[in-house]
Amino acid sequence: MKTPVITRFAPSPTGFLHIGGARTALFNWLYARHTGGRMLLRIEDTDRQRSTPEATAAILDGLAWLGLTWDGEPISQFARASRHKEVAEELVARGQAYYCYCSPEEIEAMREKARAEGRPPRYDGTWRDKDPAEAPSGVKPVIRIKAPLEGETVIHDRVQGDVRFPNKDLDDFIILRSDGTPTYMHAVVVDDHDMGVTHVIRGDDHLTNAARQAIIYRAMGWDIPVMAHIPLIHGPDGGKLSKRHGALGVEAYRAMGYLPSALCNYLARLGWSHGDDEVMTTEQMIEWFDIDDVNKGAARFDFQKMEALNGIHMRQMDDEALFGIFIATLPHLEGGQAFLDKLDEKRRGQLRSALPGLKERAKTLLELLDGAGFLVAERPLTIDDKAAELLDGDARAMLATLAEEMAGLGDWTAESTEAAVRNFAENTGRKLGKVAQPLRAALTGRTTSPGIFDVLAVLGREESLGRIRDQAVEK
């Protein structure tokens, strides 16, 4: 029977869930879902100075917002310190590790000597074969692994291929500090083994760690998980991703109005592809994703592409689903809470009606909010500078006449108001734009909006006529 796939996402809670971590989580999640397996979550909180509960909460919130649900309870690495110590001591008992009593000064002297001789600054194995009886009194030792002295360690990587590390470069690294706490290198191996992790999918900046971790696995006689080291995300110029180029936490993307489904789609395409498909649903990504198809080369982050993709997702999304996400996101958008506070039941209905037109003109929820502002604007409207230019004396006089004609309409719909405005333009010898543009300025305070007849229908007779008359003057 085939062993079920178990992946894991293991962030350090020292800040928000950044975009690179989000993609790593996504790849782990997609592969687990694709294979019918599980994705576990481990919080690597052993750095007590930098790890905070707030950062842990932010990471969990970011994953939940993206829809990357984990299986089981999150595991705290710090809480497993006694288990890490137990395995380190077992390695000593097996003869695969040893106590080292070197002082920091002695270690530094070794490194200086190695540098002077043109060798890498490595620990020289002083205590590797020493009799523990020679241990100095009053000195708390560290535990070091007995790394192989010759040959090479080969990592069979699903993305990078076979990667070879000369064992002479790996040295006898520390697995347990003198205070009894584990090093990252050791804790990761013990946790992955105990959690039953079958596939380790992480950034290729961890590739050198894989060689050292393989030594611990072999020393314990444990199976080494399948390794897949995915390329890092670079900026548009090919350099390290900076905040200016997108190296932000996912909460920043929520505040910029990106849909979680669109962000996941974009992140999946950074380093992985499925033919020429650019726009994918979550279900399609789960069906198509395979870790073997991830590219070795670094992917370049492009804000414009992501924004365009977000716009496509918004336009393709069911209106009711988009309405729900928009309402839920409003508290995270600049000006969104104030908009939300004004959304009574009537205006919620108006927003639902306006959504088809609004989403055609928006690439983000922030732009959608901006476009929807006219719905909650208080009379008399604040008119922006461009719109004010359209409302000269002739235009205002025209609006007064138009308001009187439209007041007599029986039905007030997009179709009936369009017919009335077109008739008015024709009867007064004006082009439609010469009527519609000042009308838009009066109704929304701006020069851009959804279709003007949709705006009239959404606002309704009373509000529309009130706004037109506010900007009109009698002849």
UniProtKB/Swiss-Prot annotation:
Binding site for ATP: K243
Enzyme class: ligase
Protein family according to the UniProt entry: Belongs to the class-I aminoacyl-tRNA synthetase family. Glutamate--tRNA ligase type 1 subfamily.
Quaternary context: Monomer.
Catalytic activity, as annotated: tRNA(Glu) + L-glutamate + ATP = L-glutamyl-tRNA(Glu) + AMP + diphosphate
Subcellular location field: Cytoplasm
Region Disordered, residue ranges: 116-137
Protein name per UniProt: Glutamate--tRNA ligase 2
Record bears the keyword ATP-binding: yes
Record's keyword terms, sorted: Aminoacyl-tRNA synthetase, ATP-binding, Cytoplasm, Ligase, Nucleotide-binding, Protein biosynthesis
Segments carrying motif 'KMSKS' region: 240-244
EC number of the protein: 6.1.1.17
Pfam families from the UniProt entry: Anticodon_2 (PF19269), tRNA-synt_1c (PF00749)
A GO CC term attached to the entry: cytosol
Gene name tied to this protein: gltX2
